[in-house]
Amino acid sequence: MQYQVDTHTHTVASSHAYSTIHDYIAVAKQKGIRLFANTDHGPAMADAPHFWHFVNLRVLPRMVDGVGILRGIEANIKNIDGEIDFFGDYLKQLDIVLAGFHEPVYPPSDKATHTEAMINTIKSGKVDIITHPGNPAYPIDIEAVARAAAEYGVALEINNSSFEVSRKGSEANCTAIAKAAKEFGTILVMGSDSHVAFSLGGFARAQAIIDEVAYPPSRLLNRSPSALLTFLAARGHETVADLIPLFSDDEPCC
């Protein structure tokens, strides 16, 4: 099954990634991806783009050759208070805000601290999707996080890269997250976390977990471009208003 939406990609602006926006568009056309988010690492990461990179994302076209582009960021959770490394009115210029734990910015500590930091990030209202919450380096109280995400309308990511490239040992945690999300009504999204365009839309391992727990397709943000855009608009991203009409006739892939 080919999903048409990918919410998590990195370009050469993050210097440990290897593809340009043009590369992603070309691969998206080949694979039938209709909408993807450009979400380079937040500026607190050592090799992340400069702050101005995110401010200037408005120069990106909305649509190129039938492929929609979301202007976003994968911000870094900085502390137990759930603060991230992007702020203020600049957040309103973005279409989508992801955030997660990254060792160079917020080193692992203990389960209680990780849980409090993640829940505070969810409660902040600044973040739409929590990335790779199944990372075994950052154990969390999965049920507490899933409940908070459901309450505040924040999506949890099942990160496909965690099974193939990094964060090895994530399978059990991600399965538990998917089960908790099913139980508590939490929104899920699959993210490729592509650092090279060839893996855009690669969700095979994440999809296996979604299928294993019989998570409802109606709550999966990848199901259609309009599903993701409606979610983002409901979360206050007025910037997606000009994209919504371009996908008004789409049909869920599943």
Swiss-Prot record:
GO BP annotations listed: bacterial-type flagellum-dependent swarming motility
Highest taxon in the source lineage: Bacteria
Binding site for Zn(2+) 3: 74, 102, 132
EC numbers: 3.1.3.-
Binding annotation for Zn(2+) 2: 16, 41, 195
UniProt keyword terms in alphabetical order: Hydrolase, Metal-binding, Zinc
Pfam families reported for this sequence: PHP
Cofactor: binding comment: Binds 3 Zn(2+) ions per subunit.
List of residues binding Zn(2+) 1: 8, 10, 74, 193
SUPFAM superfamilies in alphabetical order: PHP domain-like
Required cofactor(s): Zn(2+)
Single GO molecular function: zinc ion binding
GO CC field: cytosol
Name of the top EC class for this enzyme: hydrolase
NCBIfam families (alphabetical): PRK09248.1
Family per record: Belongs to the PHP family.
UniProt name for this protein: Probable phosphatase Shew185_1467
The organism of origin for this protein: Shewanella baltica (strain OS185)
